[in-house]
From Swiss-Prot:
Disruption phenotype: RNAi-mediated knockdown causes a complete loss of nlp-29 expression following fungal infection by D.coniospora and a partial reduction following physical injury.
Listed PANTHER family: RECEPTOR FOR ACTIVATED PROTEIN KINASE C RACK1 (PTHR19868)
This protein's record includes keyword Repeat: yes
A single GO cellular-component term on record: cytosol
GO MF, one example: protein kinase C binding
Family: Belongs to the WD repeat G protein beta family. Ribosomal protein RACK1 subfamily.
Record function comment: Required for the expression of antimicrobial peptide nlp-29 in response to fungal infection or physical injury.
Organism per entry: Caenorhabditis elegans
One Pfam family matching this protein: WD40
Any single biological process term in GO: negative regulation of translational frameshifting
Protein name as it appears in the record: Small ribosomal subunit protein RACK1
Source organism, top-level taxon: Eukaryota
WD repeat locations: 5-48, 58-99, 100-141, 143-186, 187-227, 228-268, 269-320
Length: 325
């Protein structure tokens, strides 16, 4: 049987703060990468299709999107690749025209840091989560259409995501109250509370077919939930704080940023198949420890994994065939 492995092929270097989120878009075999950072910017990268042999830089920032005046916590790309959406600790969201490289809308309503943002599958609706403990729904004109308060989180809302389907769409949210919540988009009412985490939840990710989601956070447990049945499926041990998660777009893999490592599980047999660690001299990062991996994104073809770290670097891994013994 052919075995696949992840191989570090290079880096993207340009941020001067932690890389808080990464988003990708591919058109005509050309991948555009966006990254948000604590340096208050969003960088747009051109990524080389051919990786260098020395594992050095494999792309360059071609544009810097500026406007936020505090850490940028999240960035996503519209499904047509024309727009980006960002959230910041400056309490606002911004919509960006990627062709022009300018912010076209500023979304003002949250009273505290915006921690997470997302586009609906049809790009017509926007959701945001904040330290003000609220979830807000917006249109693309930056009008707040609804604020979820009934049954909402009792602590910071750390992450919000739409299901990828336009049919019976839901929003999945999680927060520092240790709860993962699923909301009906049609009426903004709570559909399910997923309870099981023993610490704050940092991240949720929804599978490409919308049938399940995974959550992770302080307790180091990757929990899988059935979104259709509204039940817990199983738990995978991360053994350290989980900062980010992403399903592969075309393999039955779940990828998690766990402390300084990246763990990849094959969900078919529920086994960890890979653990990726940055090879870095400990003196090169703060507190003499390895940089933490805090953001993850796959390319749309599932061949490339982009990982953002607290040493301000994006490391780029590619799926390759493992050499047989």
């Amino acid at each position: 049987m052919v075995q696949e492995q992840m191989k570090l092929t290079g880096t993207l270097e340009g941020h001067t703060g932690w890389v808080t989120q990464i988003a990708t878009y591919t058109r005509n075999d050309k991948t555009t990468v966006l990254s948000s950072s604590r340096d208050k910017t969003i960088l747009v990268w051109d990524v080389d299709s051919v990786a260098p042999v020395d594992e050095g830089p494999i792309g360059r920032p071609v544009r810097s999107l500026t406007g936020h005046n505090h850490f940028v916590s999240d960035v996503v790309i519209s499904s047509d690749g024309q727009f980006a959406l960002s959230g910041s600790w400056d309490k606002t969201l911004r919509l960006w025209d990627l062709n022009q490289g300018v912010s076209t809308r500023q979304f003002i309503s949250h009273t505290k840091d915006v921690l997470s943002v997302a586009f609906s599958a049809d790009n017509r609706q926007i959701v945001s989560g904040s330290r003000d403990k609220s979830i807000k729904l917006w249109n693309t004109l930056a009008q707040c259409k609804y604020t979820i308060t009934d049954d909402c989180h009792t602590d910071w809302v750390s992450t919000v995501r739409f299901s990828p389907s336009n049919r019976d769409p839901v929003i999945v949210s999680a927060g520092w109250d240790k709860v993962v919540k699923v909301w009906n988009l049609g009426n903004c009412r709570l559909k399910t509370n997923h309870i099981g985490h023993t610490g704050y939840v940092n991240t949720v990710t929804v599978s490409p077919d919308g049938s399940l989601c995974a959550s992770g956070g302080k307790d180091g447990q990757a929990m899988l939930w059935d979104l259709n049945e509204g039940k817990h499926l199983y738990t995978l041990p991360g053994n350290d704080v989980i900062n980010a998660m992403s399903f592969s777009p075309n393999r039955y893999w779940l990828c998690a940023a766990v402390g300084s490592s990246i763990k990849i599980w094959d969900l078919e047999d529920k086994k960890e198949i890979e653990e990726l660690k940055p090879e870095i001299a400990s003196s090169g990062s703060s507190r003499g420890s390895s940089p933490q991996c805090i953001s993850l994104a796959w390319s749309q073809d599932g061949q490339t994994l982009f990982a953002g770290y607290t040493d301000n670097i994006i490391r780029v891994y590619q799926v390759s065939i493992r050499a047989s013994n």
